[in-house]
Amino acid sequence: MLWNLRCWKLTILVCGLSAAQSLISFGPMNLSAEEPTGELAQRLSKLEVTQYAPAPGYSEGPTWRQGEVFFCSGALLRVGRDRKVTKYLDLSPAGTFLRENGDILVCDNKNRALLNVGSDGVVSVIAEKYGDKPLNSLNDLTVDAKGNVYWTDPSGSSAQKPVGSIFRVTPTGQVDRVAGNLAFPNGLDVDPSGKNLYVIESQTQRILRYELPANAEPLGTPIPFFHLGGAGGDGCAFDAEGNLWVADFHRQETSKGRITVVNPAGKAVAYLNIPSKVVSNVTFGGPEHNEIYCTTGEPPGVFQAKVGVKGFRGHPARELRMLRKLGIRPEM
């Protein structure tokens, strides 16, 4: 999956916007080109963003835990409190999610499985099949208020061939395909209210909003929420006020990536420019949970900014059924 993802991103940078953008009806999304002017916009425009740690290659899926940052770059890597980068697990991960108990959920494409990396070092499989078929490609993930885990599968999809999917596993282990016909579904997150799932559909440069069902049903028809433009978005994270912070992958007008902050009404309220050509994902962290950590591609690594905005800590992934232990341990 990571290879496919990198190929898509290289295509975006070389060829520009997808021609399919003109075929998409964006409905009620805010398409205003006006620059945000509020207090947050002014503050972020002056904020210093620094490289927190380098990486050996293209980086994805950051998670902050007790002073350490975990991210994906050929393996699951860890940035210690001394900012030294080491390999934590020999996986092929694309996304991570911190559980309230300190465990980390991982979308792993080496084992084609959703994994739980325990704070005690035990690695367990949560999901590896859909029906009688192995999982295909796991990209990014999130958790809803009921403890269901959602992940995107963009494999083989494009604007011309929208075959991407969203999957869900319940706390009891039931795996379902809950949405399809997507043009490269990428980052996703559940808002603080627990009522809505937001998904970045990268190859249409838009963010979609799904109302979460009351029961174990598939997702309904999505509502177009925001049009990013540029090369489309990648990963995202909510702050405590319900604003969505989006890794706005690459902006042709600046030849850099940025974080775009979108309020609950679907309006861009601030931008944070990142000193890298591409920005892949973002998470909140720090002792006060008011810093952001974003992963990048050129140069590869983790960048940090003290934004002074409290991040939403995510809904708790309660007791999850573990299928089996994987038999590997972190490289401590």
Regions found by a protein language model. Name each.
Residues E35-P56, P222:
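A short helix->beta-strand "capping" segment at the edge of beta-propeller domains
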Residues E48-A53, R83-L89, S124-G131, Q174-G180, ...:
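A short beta-strand motif characteristic of beta-propeller blades
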Residues Y52-G67, C72-G74, D90-D108, A113, ...:
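Beta-rich, blade/repeat-based domains predominating
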Residues A75-L77, A113-L115, S165-F167, R206-L208, ...:
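A short loop-to-beta-strand structural motif that recurs across blades of beta-propeller domains
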Residues N111, K161-V163, T204, L219, ...:
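A detector of repeated loop/turn-to-beta-strand junctions in beta-rich toroidal repeat architectures
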Residues Y210-E217, K306-R313:
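Short loop/turn segments immediately following beta-strands, especially the blade-tip
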Residues L212-S280:
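Glycine/small-residue-rich hydrophobic helix-like segments
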